[in-house]
């Protein structure tokens, strides 16, 4: 059973104090039996969105009730219900390059998770993502991708390769889980030689269906770590328009549905041009997703577009292939050495 309680005409401090008091009482009386979520809004609000936000936190709380850990490799070891259902053995991270259309050079990448079945075949996320979101296990998968990305960047650093910015997708379950900032900070601390400014949290569409104030507060927990944010699938829904004006994203990713029609639909091209102009005014990067041909590239360049991602340039590829084809040596051409790697006389 699920019970929803609504607290009206109170301040945020009083509300949170009540929440934590009730949560503590329930955990003492019914240890590991009660799942608990909450959400706060000020001024006008949508009850449906608040319940969705609270339920997302509750599903994350379910994992802790069940005794799981926020360790980033957890989905690989413990996601047995998902793996058994979909026939998966493990998860791997692929990278899809982001390209400067003016020069054709790779300027970054998006980290994307894939499953591997018992035959060693790659399984797309559409086969398992919905189940992981409904079970709340998506948070551990997001953290696994973040940790795997940082581990890859550390390997590249030690090889003397030039590091590029990488974006990692975060679902609403991960973004709104109270324990996520601590888990992210713990992961970042394991890679002290990788600048957090090279990482971008890409907010998936599912995270957008919440109160704007709640979204801003959730993002503010991660900003002190040096992380930036991108708004994914911009233009696919009307609700994104209000987010564009009220939330300080660092990057806007144009939805593929907008890019697909820019050759045949003059209005789509004008809309894309306006969005690119707004991004430039607000000092945001703008990336066109789903670019599939040279005609789209030419059209985007003509209206001020600079960056793109899509099959025309590259499909999502394994880490090693990305390293070999899209990374170059640093200026020195020599790997940097950590203090732990350096030897002194007598060692």
Where are these regions (language model features)?
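Catalytic/regulatory signature loops of cyclic-dinucleotide turnover enzymes
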Residues: 27-35, 48-76, 81-92, 119, ...
């Amino acid at each position: 059973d699920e019970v929803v309680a609504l607290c009206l005409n109170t301040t945020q401090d009083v509300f949170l104090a009540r929440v934590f008091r009730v949560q503590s009482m329930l955990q003492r009386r019914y240890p590991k039996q009660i799942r608990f979520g909450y959400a706060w809004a000020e001024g006008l609000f949508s009850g449906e969105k608040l319940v969705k936000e609270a339920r997302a936190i509750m599903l994350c709380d379910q994992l802790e009730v069940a005794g799981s850990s926020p360790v980033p490799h957890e989905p690989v070891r413990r996601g047995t219900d998902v793996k058994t259902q979909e026939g998966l053995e493990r998860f791997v991270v692929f990278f899809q390059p982001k390209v400067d259309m003016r020069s054709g050079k790779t300027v970054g990448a998006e980290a994307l998770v894939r499953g591997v079945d018992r035959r060693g075949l790659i399984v797309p996320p559409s086969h398992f993502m919905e189940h992981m979101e409904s079970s709340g296990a998506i948070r551990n998968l997001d953290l696994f991708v973040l940790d795997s990305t940082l581990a890859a960047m550390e390997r590249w650093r030690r090889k003397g390769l030039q590091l590029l910015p990488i974006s990692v997708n975060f679902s609403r379950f991960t973004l709104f889980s109270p324990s996520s900032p601590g888990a992210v900070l713990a992961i970042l601390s394991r890679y002290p030689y990788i600048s957090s400014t090279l990482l971008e949290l890409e907010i998936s569409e599912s995270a957008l269906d919440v109160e704007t104030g709640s979204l801003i507060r959730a993002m503010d927990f991660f900003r002190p770590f040096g992380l930036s944010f991108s708004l994914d699938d911009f233009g696919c829904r009307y609700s994104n328009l209000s987010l564009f004006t009220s939330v300080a994203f660092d990057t806007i990713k144009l939805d593929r549905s907008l890019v697909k029609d820019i050759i045949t639909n003059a209005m789509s091209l004008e809309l894309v041009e306006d969005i690119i102009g707004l991004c430039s005014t607000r000092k945001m990067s703008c990336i066109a997703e789903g670019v599939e041909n040279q005609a789209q590239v030419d059209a985007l360049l003509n209206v001020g577009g600079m960056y793109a991602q899509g099959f025309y340039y590259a499909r999502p590829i394994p880490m090693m292939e990305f390293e070999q084809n899209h990374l170059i040596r640093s200026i020195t051409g020599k790997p940097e050495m950590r203090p732990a790697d350096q030897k002194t006389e007598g060692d």
